[in-house]
Each structure stands twice: as structure tokens, then as C-alpha cells.
């Protein structure tokens, strides 16, 4: 065989191999499902649980935030005063409860007994005086008004005696169970108010709930804030999720736990890796923000893909291409 013919056959063979390889690669790529999504935007609005004057903010927009970091504080003074008042309330309620449990001292019982004797003497005198007035009334020596005054004095003395006797009886038998229970309930209420005052004072310090990046600083020190007013907005950096949508005919390929490749414009040849973490059980129309070659009237299912090797280059809101082909199993 002549040399030019051999060279021609070799070139033809090489071209055929390249064409076949290209066809095989493209068919392999085309066989896999491709979706389009975005890195999920996950934010937290941070606020105080109590209101007051903002005393300080320790962070600014763009700062990296660590969970547990002190972000700012309200003016403590009103809540410190409330705490002192609550502590005093507990002391008063505790003393009253202890007094109810201890009962009455011997000196108090003796004083109550003396009061009964004094009231008894006053009643006896009033009763005897009334009896004499009755005799005089019968002989028409006194007026009806004098008799009525004597009866009124007797009745008042009798009521005073009854009150003194009841008090002495209470002192001797101790406090009633109902009174003790009421004092105990008052003590528990005071303790609950103290716990709330302590919590309110603690809540004047703003603590970061998670790691992230500070997006917005909505207020400045000196502002008067209501409870729950947004002070800062935090962008959560971990974990990184990608939101994508799949139509019903491809839904069977999106089993939770399946490995996924994620491509970005900045790293077209170096994909991120992820796993399907969640498939929505309900269908919805394709959101306007999602890139798709299909009609938006199609019903789709939302996917949450957890990125397993995320880095700082993968930013929230960034568009990504999601591939389900066999490469994900071999990367």
C-alpha cells in the first residue's frame, strides 16, 4: 500500500475516533437531567424581645458574625430597677408566708386574751346598765330614747367582745389552711415576676443566633425600639442550599439523597457537589425567577439541594446549573 493511502486512512481513523468520542460524550451529557436554580437566600431578622432605648451596636454591614456574639445592647437602667422591685416583692411575700407557717407568738396570744377580758368587762357593764334602764323605763323615769341608747351601747360592746374572742381563737389554733395557701400562692407569683424581670434584663443584650454575614443595620444607637423591631438582618452562610424545580415527568429522578453536580459561571469546569435533601410534596407553577426552556404554565416541584463542599465563592442568589447525569456518581 502506498504511503499517502496509509496516511489518509490513519487520518480518517483519527477523525472517526474523535467524532465518535464527541458523539458519545454529548449523548452522555444529553442523557442526564439538567435543571436551573439559585443558591437559596436565607436571612434572619434580629430584634430585641423587649423595648427600650438602643444604647450600642457593635457590628456593621458586611461583618462576619459568629453564633453567640454580642451584637448590641439596650439601656439597662429601667430593667435593673424592675429587677430590684421584683426581688423586694419576693422578700415581702416570703416573710408573709413564713409568718403564716409559724403561727402566733405567746406574747400575741396573751395580748389577745387580755383584749377578750377587757371586752368582756365592757360588755358586762353595758348589759347591766341596759337592765337598769329597762326598769326605769317601766316606771317611766326615763325616755324611750334613753332606753334605745343603752341597748345600742350593749349591742356594740357585744360585737367588740365577739371580735376579740374570734381573734383569740385564731391565735390559739393558728392560721387557716386557706390563708396559708393564699400566702404561698402570693410567694410563687412574686417569684415568677422576679424570673420575668431577670429574663427581661437578660434580653437587653442582643446575641447572634447563628453564624453569618451582616446584611443590614436598620437602626442606630439612641433610637427608641419596640419589642420585636428589626435591628439587624443576618445572612446565614451555612448550610448552603440550592433551590431548583423539576417537572412531573422527571420527578422520579429526584430521590432524596441522590448525588448532584452544581455548575456556576465562575467555575464551569469545576462543579460543586451536593445531595437532594428535600422534594416538595406539592406542585406549583414555575416561579418567574427560575431560568427554564419550558413553558412557565407547567407545574413543577421544588427541590432543596444541600451543597456538601460549599466555599465563600458560592454566594446567595447566585444562579447554578444542576446536573443529574452519571458524572455525579464518579466525581
UniProtKB/Swiss-Prot annotation:
Keywords: Coiled coil, Periplasm, Signal. Residues 1-19 form the signal peptide. It is found in: Periplasm. GO terms for cellular component: periplasmic space. The keyword Coiled coil applies. Residues 140-209 form a coiled coil. InterPro entries: CusB_D23 (IPR032317), UPF0194_membrane_YbhG (IPR022936), UPF0194_transport (IPR050465). One of its GO terms (biological process) is response to antibiotic. Pfam families: HlyD_D23. It comes from the Bacteria. The keyword Coiled coil applies. HAMAP family: UPF0194. Belongs to the UPF0194 family. This is UPF0194 membrane protein YbhG. It comes from Salmonella typhimurium (strain LT2 / SGSC1412 / ATCC 700720). The gene is ybhG.
Amino acid at each position: 500500500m502506498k504511503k499517502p493511502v496509509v496516511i489518509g486512512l490513519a487520518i480518517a481513523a483519527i477523525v472517526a475516533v474523535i467524532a465518535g468520542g464527541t458523539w458519545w460524550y454529548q449523548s452522555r451529557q444529553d442523557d442526564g437531567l439538567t435543571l436551573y436554580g439559585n443558591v437559596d437566600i436565607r436571612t434572619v431578622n434580629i430584634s430585641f424581645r423587649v423595648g427600650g432605648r438602643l444604647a450600642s451596636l457593635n457590628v456593621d454591614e458586611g461583618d462576619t458574625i459568629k453564633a453567640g456574639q454580642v451584637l448590641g445592647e439596650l439601656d439597662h437602667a429601667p430593667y435593673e430597677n424592675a429587677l430590684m422591685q421584683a426581688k423586694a416583692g419576693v422578700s415581702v411575700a416570703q416573710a408573709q408566708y413564713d409568718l403564716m407557717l409559724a403561727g402566733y407568738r405567746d406574747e400575741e396570744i396573751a395580748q389577745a386574751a387580755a383584749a377578750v377580758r377587757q371586752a368582756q368587762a365592757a360588755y358586762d357593764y353595758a348589759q347591766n346598765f341596759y337592765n337598769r334602764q329597762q326598769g326605769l323605763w317601766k316606771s317611766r323615769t326615763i325616755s324611750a330614747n334613753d332606753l334605745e341608747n343603752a341597748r345600742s351601747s350593749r349591742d356594740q360592746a357585744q360585737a367588740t367582745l365577739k371580735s376579740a374572742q374570734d381573734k383569740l381563737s385564731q391565735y390559739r389554733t393558728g392560721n387557716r389552711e386557706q390563708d396559708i395557701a393564699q400566702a404561698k400562692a402570693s410567694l410563687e407569683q412574686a417569684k415568677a415576676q422576679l424570673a420575668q424581670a431577670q429574663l427581661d434584663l437578660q434580653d437587653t443584650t442582643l446575641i447572634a443566633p447563628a453564624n453569618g454575614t451582616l446584611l443590614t443595620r436598620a437602626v442606630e444607637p439612641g433610637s427608641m425600639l419596640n419589642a420585636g423591631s428589626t435591628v439587624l438582618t443576618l445572612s446565614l452562610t451555612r448550610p448552603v442550599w440550592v433551590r431548583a424545580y423539576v417537572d412531573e415527568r422527571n420527578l422520579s429522578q429526584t430521590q432524596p439523597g441522590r448525588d448532584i453536580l452544581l455548575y456556576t459561571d465562575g467555575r464551569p469546569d469545576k462543579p460543586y457537589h451536593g445531595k437532594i435533601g428535600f422534594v416538595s410534596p406539592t406542585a406549583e407553577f414555575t416561579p418567574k425567577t427560575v431560568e427554564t426552556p419550558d413553558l412557565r404554565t407547567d407545574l413543577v416541584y421544588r427541590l432543596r439541594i444541600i451543597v456538601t463542599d460549599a466555599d465563600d465563592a458560592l454566594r446567595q442568589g447566585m444562579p447554578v446549573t444542576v446536573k443529574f447525569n452519571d458524572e455525579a456518581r464518579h466525581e
